[in-house]
A protein has these predicted regions:
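Extended intrinsically disordered, low-complexity coil regions enriched in Ser, Thr, Gly, Ala
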Residues: 83-88, 98-106, 203-208, 240-245, ...
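Sequence context of c-type cytochrome heme-c attachment sites
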Residues: 30-33, 46, 50-79, 107-111, ...
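Bacterial N-terminal signal peptides
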Residues: 5-16
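Electrostatic cytochrome c docking/interface patches
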Residues: 18-37, 160-191
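Electron-transfer interface patches adjacent to heme c in soluble/periplasmic c-type cytochromes
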Residues: 60-91, 111-121, 213-255, 267
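The canonical Cys-X-X-Cys-His
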Residues: 32, 38-48, 89, 124, ...
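Membrane-embedded segments
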Residues: 87, 96, 101-127
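Extended, well-folded interaction surfaces typified by the phenylalanyl-tRNA synthetase beta subunit core
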Residues: 136-158
């Protein structure tokens, strides 16, 4: 009888292990969807105007250097990231290097993603595997001379790109000690996964952040609406400050990017 029980337990162990692994995968996928929405991947990798397939690429980003076309990041093995490994994906986000070893243009905000936690990258990768593959070839960027010379990106990286882990730093005095953890979480979302500063901070001639002007409005190209100022100019206790805060909360919670499909709340 004991022998039968042991045999039955041995047979059931793989099944229980598979169930536990399945639950872990589902949890990773749910977390990955959260990271996906926080990072705003949909906005740059979906051609909403042309009613393109989700994450199939083609979204045009106008800049002073020319137009960048978002690539296909569906699991399609030929045109998307279906042939990538998690290590390839991690290197792309944290180092800005493609699986072929080519540097990405910093229009892809790896300068912020480089500080993303590895567990967040793994979760995002797990969720992307659930996306419907799209057999859509990537469009070449349409850049002004001489920015089409990709080797120049290496010079830019040497000057302005410093990878590393995220360090929140000390919160301002207005943040209560009991809210420190929330502030650090918010700082991570804003500076890293949300990469808000990439669009809301002015840049110099070569695309370097003008950090003294962090969170001020920026216009990427002529005839393109500027991104709004994110600094808390008006105090919260004033009528203007309360109204401004309510507008930000409303946009983050309810809108679906009426102004621009680039913002992270596009979904």
């Amino acid at each position: 009888m004991l022998r039968r029980g042991l045999m039955l337990a041995a047979l059931l162990l793989p099944l229980s292990g598979a169930a536990a692994a399945g639950e872990a995968d589902e949890a990773a996928i749910r977390r990955g969807e959260y990271v996906f929405n926080a990072a705003g991947c949909y906005g740059c990798h979906t051609d909403v105007k042309a009613k393109g397939a989700p994450l199939a690429g083609g979204r045009r980003l106008k800049t002073p250097f020319g137009d960048f076309l978002g690539p296909n990041i569906t699991p399609d093995p030929e045109h998307g990231i279906g042939g990538w490994s998690l290590a390839d994906f991690t290197r792309a986000l944290r180092e800005g290097i493609s699986p072929a070893g080519d540097p990405y243009y910093p229009a892809f905000p790896y300068t912020s993603f480089s500080r993303m936690k590895e567990e967040d990258i793994a979760d995002l990768w797990a969720w992307l595997q659930t996306v419907e593959p799209a057999d859509r070839a990537n469009d070449p960027h349409e850049l002004a001379f001489p920015y089409g010379w990709r080797w120049l990106t290496g010079v830019w990286r040497a000057l302005y790109f410093t990878p590393g882990d995220f360090v929140a730093g000390d919160p301002p005095a207005i943040v209560a000690e009991e809210d420190r953890e929330k502030w650090e979480r918010g700082a991570y979302l804003v500076r890293v996964s949300g990469h808000c500063g990439e669009c809301h901070t002015p840049r110099g001639v070569l695309g370097r952040w003008m950090r003294i002007s962090s969170w001020l409005a920026i216009r990427l190209a002529p005839r393109v609406a500027p991104f709004p100022i994110l600094r808390p100019i008006a105090r919260l206790e004033s009528v203007a400050g309360v109204w401004r805060t309510l507008k930000v909360i409303w946009k983050l919670a309810w809108t679906r990017t009426v102004i621009s499909p680039v913002a992270p709340w596009a979904r």
